[in-house]
């Protein structure tokens, strides 16, 4: 889920978070099957992330919402090809994957064009493709490409582990 948050708003840095987690299915305890995370960012924006394996009607749901001063964005894995973009005082806009109005970065991992749903295999394929591009650039010492090329590297993995640890610490301390 953190990967989704970072992909949606890579320029934002999380400064504070608060987590609540639950184990609704007792046989899964002590592992949680539902969690809510509230996040504050360095520019004053706030975000929320909800992940659940028990939300009736939404199997293994993950929802990410980031709220800023002027606009909000929301992504939900039940509608993975859509991103809701909501500007204050305007109707919500649904941005569809693969459409020409998206930025080149948004289109870079599009495999089969808009209107056709992509899935888990394409997502993994995109990650492996990005790893391969980064490894090739590193072998060629192409610092220019690596400076602007985003992929989940070891730093992202370590940050993700720290993020989960902070979520656990927050929930264990009864932050909610």
Where are these regions (language model features)?
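A general structural signal for well-ordered alpha-helical segments in protein cores
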Residues: 1, 128-132, 164
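C-terminal glycine/acidic-rich active-site capping loop/insertion
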Residues: 36, 41, 70-155
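Alpha-helical scaffold segments in carbohydrate-active enzymes
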Residues: 160-167
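Rossmann-like dinucleotide-binding domain that binds NAD(P)(H)
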Residues: 1-46, 50-59, 155
């Amino acid at each position: 889920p953190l990967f989704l948050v970072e992909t949606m708003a890579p320029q934002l840095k999380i400064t504070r978070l608060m987590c609540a987690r639950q184990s609704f299915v007792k046989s899964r305890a002590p592992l949680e099957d539902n969690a809510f995370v509230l996040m504050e960012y360095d520019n004053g924006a706030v975000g929320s992330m909800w992940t659940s394996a028990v939300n009736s009607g939404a199997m293994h749901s993950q929802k990410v919402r980031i709220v800023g001063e002027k606009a909000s964005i929301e992504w939900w894995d039940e509608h993975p090809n859509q991103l809701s973009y909501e500007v204050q005082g305007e109707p919500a806009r649904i941005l569809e994957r693969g459409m020409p109005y998206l930025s080149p970065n948004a289109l870079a991992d599009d495999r089969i064009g808009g209107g056709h749903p992509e899935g888990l295999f394409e997502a993994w394929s995109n990650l492996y493709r990005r790893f391969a591009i980064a490894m090739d650039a590193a072998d060629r010492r192409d610092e220019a490409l690596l400076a602007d090329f985003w992929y989940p590297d070891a730093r992202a993995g370590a940050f993700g582990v720290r993020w989960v640890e902070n979520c656990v610490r927050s929930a264990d301390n009864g932050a909610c």
